[in-house]
Amino acid sequence: MPIQNYRDLIVWQRAMDLLTECYRVARLLPPSETYALGAHLERAAVAVAAHIAGGHARERAEFLESLTGATASLREVETLLLAATRVCLLSGDQIQTGMQLADEVGRMLTALRRSLGAPHLQPGVSSHAAGAPSAGVSAGATAG
């Protein structure tokens, strides 16, 4: 099925799953963190999906820049989830799904950037993300 808009991108769909999970996790935080860590987590998760959607409407080079922005926001999400466990606000079990979704979205973003001809991988991309198979490009970038 050809991609007609950003909603057809599986990476955007999975980013929306991550967004939903981050909102769920934010509700587990104590009230004192609702407007600090919780709100920041929600904004970062929204930014991942928003960068993908907004970039899809642009030219290739701008789309690549937007995917880089999505990756940066994704790293924020991961850091905020890990920070919540570091300061004992959440358990590892409570952030596990979010971390798994973040890993999946990260691999898909890397594969999509490669398929669009990104000149190099963004610094900080994990080694398993760098080894994403080329078959994952079409599976990760398009709706099936």
Feature-to-residue mapping (PLM):
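Amphipathic alpha-helical assembly/interaction segments
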Residues: M1-G144
